[in-house]
């Protein structure tokens, strides 16, 4: 951690180099926040992370429910497909999406980056929600159906409230993962 503390201390250095501490100053931070291009990149990065995490959480939640309700032999196949993006290196995934988008003549920009971030965030959400689904008591679902609940009512009244902590955790994991793999757009 020494290099991190060193950088933090010298961020407040009035001098222009990191050889000698010449006095306390916030000028480097002032220069940082005066750079409008950097602020724009920061805003775009957080917006992209927010939006991609939201979409990935919606898709990943219903994907996890689908995997959970699938037959055992299909569950393994779906989980294997889901895990491909988790084990593949980020550079390979990025290059694959670039090839896909250019081959499909999809314009590169915010939407292509958003689609890529959603695609590599979905597996994280699925992996956060599936364990919670497996902990769920199947008798609650059966009881809801026995009492006349429709599939939508069971989902809304039983399953989603039970999954809420895992859904929130999945969202924040996807958000963090998206922030980690930020991209400059435009």
Where on the chain are the PLM-derived regions?
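Transmembrane alpha-helix signature in integral membrane proteins
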Residues: 12, 36-67
């Amino acid at each position: 951690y020494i290099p991190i503390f060193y950088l933090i201390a010298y961020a407040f250095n009035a001098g222009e180099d990191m050889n000698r501490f010449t006095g306390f100053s916030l000028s480097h931070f002032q220069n940082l926040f005066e750079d409008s291009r950097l602020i724009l990149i920061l805003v775009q990065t957080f917006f992209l992370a927010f939006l991609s995490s939201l979409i990935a959480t919606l898709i990943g939640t219903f994907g996890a429910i689908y995997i959970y309700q699938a037959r055992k032999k299909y569950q393994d196949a779906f989980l294997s497909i889901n895990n491909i993006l988790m084990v593949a290196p980020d550079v390979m995934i990025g290059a694959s999406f670039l090839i896909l988008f250019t081959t499909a003549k999809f314009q590169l920009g915010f939407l292509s980056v958003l689609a890529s971030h959603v695609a590599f965030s979905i597996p994280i959400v699925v992996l956060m929600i599936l364990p919670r689904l497996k902990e769920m008591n199947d008798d609650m679902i059966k009881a809801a159906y026995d009492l006349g609940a429709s599939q939508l009512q069971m989902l809304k009244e039983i399953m989603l409230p039970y999954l809420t902590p895992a859904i929130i955790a999945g969202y924040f994991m996807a958000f963090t993962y998206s922030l980690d793999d930020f991209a400059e757009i435009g």
